[in-house]
Each structure stands twice: as structure tokens, then as C-alpha cells.
Design a protein with these regions (language model features):
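Chalcogenol-based redox active-site neighborhoods
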Residues: 1-164
């Protein structure tokens, strides 16, 4: 896993809707929550994605966007997003290059881990977490990390409703 206080590796990837995402485009504009998960439509991954969905407003209040990454193809991601009303995009990483770039490796080679990075507007990793089995543990830690460095925006910025 990459360590906090280090620069987040830049990348360009295709989102599930076919558009292109460039981490560099977020510099100076948005904080980024980049989370890696094993597979769409599995119980744990669905719970994790829905936890991010249920706290989307609270995370966005810190001027942050959420991006999910797994090895599933874009069409499966699109179906997963639609089925669970996910308000954030997903990146298809079938060859594992992005997972490798972010050192999100599992203890079991065929089982990708759950790793989440909180990246600030300057492209620096501010927090890194891994919880393979506590699937909803990432969101509270993401919110704590964002609260340490990013001011909440707007007078009615929503509070967290941690699910799970």
C-alpha cells in the first residue's frame, strides 16, 4: 500500500460511462477518494459501494469526489451503478495496472484487497486504509481523514450517515 504524505501516482482511465478520468484534472480543484474493491455484485462489495453511496453527500461536502476501481468490465460496472443507484463513477481495471500502480495487492494473489486512498487537491495521499473483511469500515475513516485537512463546504453540508 502507498503511504500517506506521498504523491498519488497520476493516471488516466476510462470510466464506466465511457468518459475519461485524469487524476491530474483534479489538482487544485477536488479531493479524491479512490477505492479499490474485488468485484461487482458480491455481498461485501455491494455493502461497501452502498456505504459510499449513503455517505456521498457527507464526502462531497469536503469538496471530494469518489471513484471506485475493480477488475470488472465497464458494462458490468454500469449495471452495478444502475442497480444500486451509485452516484459516483467506476473504473474498469481488468489487467490490474491501476491496482499495481497504487500497490493495492492482496495477501491471496487471486483475491484483490479493499484499499482506499484519500488524495488531497495537491495530489498528495492524506490517508490510506485497508479492510478486507470490514467492508463498511472505509467510510468513517475517509470522513475522519477529510475532516483533518479539508473544510466542509456550504452552510448545510450534510453529516455522515454511516451505514453498515
Amino acid at each position: 500500500m502507498l503511504k500517506p504524505s506521498t504523491p498519488a501516482p497520476d493516471f488516466t482511465a476510462t470510466l464506466d460511462d465511457g468518459s475519461t478520468f485524469r487524476l491530474a484534472d483534479c489538482r487544485g480543484r477536488k479531493n479524491v477518494v479512490l477505492y479499490f474493491y474485488p468485484k461487482d455484485f458480491t455481498p461485501g462489495c455491494t455493502a461497501e459501494a452502498c456505504s459510499f453511496r449513503d455517505n456521498y453527500g457527507a464526502i462531497a461536502a469536503y469538496d471530494a469526489i469518489i471513484i471506485g476501481v475493480s477488475g470488472d468490465p465497464a458494462d458490468r460496472h454500469a449495471a452495478f451503478r444502475e442497480t444500486h443507484a451509485l452516484p459516483f463513477p467506476l473504473i474498469a481495471d481488468p489487467d490490474g495496472k491501476l491496482r499495481e500502480l497504487y500497490d493495492a495487492r492482496g495477501w491471496i494473489p487471486w483475491m484483490p484487497p479493499r484499499v482506499t486512498y484519500v488524495i488531497d487537491k495537491e495530489g498528495i495521499i492524506r490517508a490510506a486504509m485497508r479492510h478486507d473483511f470490514r467492508v463498511t469500515a472505509h467510510v468513517p475513516e475517509v470522513l475522519e481523514a477529510l475532516a483533518r485537512f479539508a473544510p466542509r463546504t456550504g452552510p448545510d453540508a450534510p453529516a455522515a450517515t454511516v451505514s453498515g
